Amino acid sequence: MKKTILSILLTLSLILLAIPNLWATDYQHTLKVEEMNFSWNLNESTMDIRISAETTGWVGIGFNPEEHMLGANIILGYVKNGKARIEDHYGTQKRAHGPDEKEGGSVNITNPEGSEENGVTTLSFTIPLNSGDKYDPPVKTDGISTMIFAYGGDRDSLRTRHHFRTTWEINLKTGEGKKR
């Protein structure tokens, strides 16, 4: 009986060692984007993302806007009472965005998590590289992506205006980026 249990434990240990990223919190790439931090992993068909800023309000990221926010796939959220609220938005105008669902799209965020510690809000989530949703343009993995970053003040509401925003050009495959 002891040999059987020992054999099972050894087998489980070997399986867990063979899957090193199962509980990994490390990211392939991390950039300090002025007042925010952006970390990500590119997988075969998805992208794991972590964004954070020194705020107790919302934080957000947008992918490949046409101009300002127009046409961007925008993910933003906040943490309230220890629970993350993360939404999938689309840039409907240069200076406006709204939930994908209101436009006829769908929410394409998985693994939503968040924390608010020592005045810093951190969100992590996974998005598909190409969801097929017209309100989530495909994420560019080769070449330069235009990325927008923003965070709001110290209020748990997505209706508040940003206190900080910036636009960067980032090569998501190499991790290189610069302010636009």
Predicted ranges, named:
Residues 1-4:
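Positively charged n-region of N-terminal signal peptides that target proteins for export
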Residues 23-180:
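Extracellular-facing/secreted segment signature in eukaryotic proteins
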Residues 8-18:
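Bacterial N-terminal signal peptides
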